[in-house]
Amino acid sequence: MIYRYPRYGQLYEASKQLRRTFSAQDFRDLQVLSQLAWFDEEFLKGDRDVRDLIRKGRNYTLEEQRLMGRKQREIMAKVLPVYKEFASRGQIEISATPYYHPILPLLCDSDIASVSHHGVPLPQRFRYPEDARHQLVKAREYMETTFGIAPVGLWPSEGSVSDEAMRIAADVGYQWFATDNGVLGRTLGSTAGAFETYRPYKWKSEGREMHCIFRDHYLSDLIGFEYSRMGAADAAQHFLDRIRENCGGRDAVVPIILDGENAWEYYEEGGREFLRQLYKRISDASDLQALSVSEALAQNGAHEIGHIFPGSWIGANFDVWIGAEEDNQAWNLLLRAREAYEAGKDNVSPAAKAMAFEEILIAQGSDWCWWYGPEHDSANRVEFDQLFRGHLANVYKSLELQPPEELSRTLLHLTVTDLHDKPTGRIKPTIDGMVSSYFEWLGSGNYRLEERSGAMHSQRNIIQSLSYGTDGQHLFLRLDFHELPVAASLELHLKTESVELEITSSRFCLERILEAAFPLRELGVQPGDPVRFQLSVWKEKLPVAAVPQQGWLEMDTNEPGDWPA
């Protein structure tokens, strides 16, 4: 996608060494080309304005950048009407996914994770099946409004199923669901091969029933991950040969299910030629027929099952979204916000109540915990973490409550040692809010925040660094800012056995920096004892930064010679 455009490739290579030397023109070219790269072949070749932008190749003007944006909106506006047209004439069947893409079984009962993974560490129990119902109803209503057809089929987020979740889906009108054949294998108690996978099932539970199909994991992954490295015709033929081989001449229903947006960027021309080759071969074949799920179910009998094993398409379990420390912390924060909503929803206006609940539904989306935990990584994990905690903070704000301080701290396990220098000697700074002398903070500890980590509502933390130290009588603190806070408050949190402290002799001053001094005796710190502390910055009743971002800073108050090396 990048090297197809010479200037884009040049900028990409330059970014590896010279990113900070980019000119305004470099950035404009990058903005235009990085968006053009995602245009479909139909528009790259068929739209004159887009062709002209590609032909120019570099030195784009502001007006050309705006033209590219208009073309994006123009093309995107055509997408939903095309789907609606195809669905209305029966050429495609549109299924639904829960509205904000939650893992339904975990909303119904987070403890279900221990069924598919015995001994998995669990958060506090989250049990709100009514939220799962709301996500399913909201999705179906939106699809009906958008396409004029209420979907009867359900692909649960990440293929995640359980008996309780599917009973709710049946109650709200869904007639079939799909998941992975790994779940089928654990349901049947044996490996699900082609014979078991290539037939419809009818699931029944407590008076509800739905048809279900199980995707061929291997064949679906060939399209998703392998065929992009083959010629289009060879890949299409290989795919159909495998289907024929697996079916062995018998009638079969072969479910092929994959993320519809992720694979094609790796194919030549966005996968268009592969799909043409595949569909042509299916259309020309006498032994193959392309069917929607509902058509396949209507034409084939179903094998009955009385239970579905709880799991997802990844490992037939829920380990991606629960069990790791970061995941479980996220679930605990979600639970506390949900409980706060129940307690406070009747104390605010209907509009505020609706806004608070919408923020909860958003925070239930599976993508947050996709990026928490050890399984996946992204250059934007910090931003995802900020957004998740921001949505939870908005729950409290909508309920006219103070968001808890814990929402100011990242859930990510950042490496603090690379950012933290411990004190090396005693200090006695002048509390004037100015850098009076280089030497006044020499010997202090210093904690530096990564520019993009920690701030809940901005792209970088307002705090640049925290310096701290002692003269044996006081705790001295210094905050350096990327930008001076306006209408903000600062809270000092101590990890101490004291229940309540009254500090009467503190001194502080904010000019270019913030400097403060707190008597150790008024902090409840005995001579020679360590002091453990954390700072947080609040604006508009929301925590926007914390130092450190997790845990506590600890400072020894002994004589410097007694300090550990």
What is the role of each PLM region?
Residues 1-53, 192-425:
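Active-site and substrate-binding clefts of carbohydrate-active enzymes
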Residues 1-116:
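N-terminal catalytic cores of secreted or lumenal carbohydrate-active enzymes
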Residues 1, 57-74, 118-132, 149-157, ...:
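The substrate-binding groove and active-site-proximal loops of carbohydrate-active enzymes
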Residues 431, 435-505, 533-545:
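Surface-exposed, glycine/proline- and aromatic-rich loop segments on solvent-exposed faces
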Residues 114-133, 170-211:
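Acidic, His- and aromatic-enriched active-site or binding-groove loops in soluble protein domains
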Residues 118-156, 241-257:
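CE4/NodB-like, metal-dependent polysaccharide N-deacetylase domain
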Residues 417-426, 493-504, 511, 521-565:
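Acidic/polar low-complexity flexible segments
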Residues 94-97, 152, 176-179, 254:
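Hydrophobic faces of well-ordered beta-strands that scaffold small-molecule active sites
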